């Protein structure tokens, strides 16, 4: 199915709008990390108790990514995007109105449903809508939108929450989604499904040991990162005893360092993806081990967060590149699985951080996170040695 030829300008506008949508969807997943203390205060709960909604959201996305992709595989893509945006916006209005924590969690589950469908179709849509010969650039634009969610979305969401209340943050995300939806309605042509959501490719993917090993690495390293990252805002305020404003600065630094990470990966990723990912995981181990010692000063935490941000961005980009390289004929299913597995890691990390904070001490989140990070480092070295060629990005 080819789309009627359009000007390059219109084609790029379509891809950019999708990238903005990716930014919005990822911002709403990450933004509660910066709002945990405020949400806890408004519902008279402990921060660690509120943190469970990070796990619920991530695991709903993880469990529903593949089923939703298959359920909607025959649906015309423009109509599907409109439907999932309506669900996304309505759920944000419910988040804004949430009269108790249960209602807030229900609204987040609605958002997670939309998120699960969105991420299982976005990569293939970007490729279809891209100007001729610009598929790789279209995919990197979507990745940039995703990366900017951590760089800008999360800190801006936190600033809005700090000054206008956390409800306003969710309302603003909903309004951003509404504007994006209107742009998509105007810009997108009819996009008949290309039946990309087929289970036939699943057995092939499961029979690829390099890919399965990569999925295991993903879940372990993401669990390590989110064990500490999910609770970084209350950690800065309650353990380090620093101000709410500094917590915002730290999130901005951590996200902003991701830009450096993506530049490093963009320059060296094609040839040295395995080495880069291994070095980044080693850097993550060091950052997690030093989190508590660094809490003695703002400068130490700031420096640590820069290295942490670089490491996690390189890891995320490296994993995506490798998954796409190992499953060139089943990118939709492979990426839906990757998204699901990534979210299992987010949920698991947030849950471990939650349990450590509730039953032990929030000061230990870095040390506990370093345990799976060390395991991930050993696993990465082993699998990159075993499959050195197939794990490198295929030439375009």
Swiss-Prot record:
The chain crosses the membrane at residues 15-35, 50-70, 81-101, 103-123, 136-156, 169-189, 202-222, 246-266, 275-295, 301-321, 333-353, 364-384. InterPro entries: MFS, MFS_dom, MFS_Efflux_Transporters, MFS_trans_sf, Sugar_effux_transptr_put. Keywords: Cell inner membrane, Cell membrane, Membrane, Sugar transport, Transmembrane, Transmembrane helix, Transport. Gene3D superfamilies: MFS general substrate transporter like domains. GO terms for cellular component: plasma membrane. NCBIfam families: PRK03545.1. Belongs to the major facilitator superfamily. SotB (TC 2.A.1.2) family. This is Probable sugar efflux transporter.
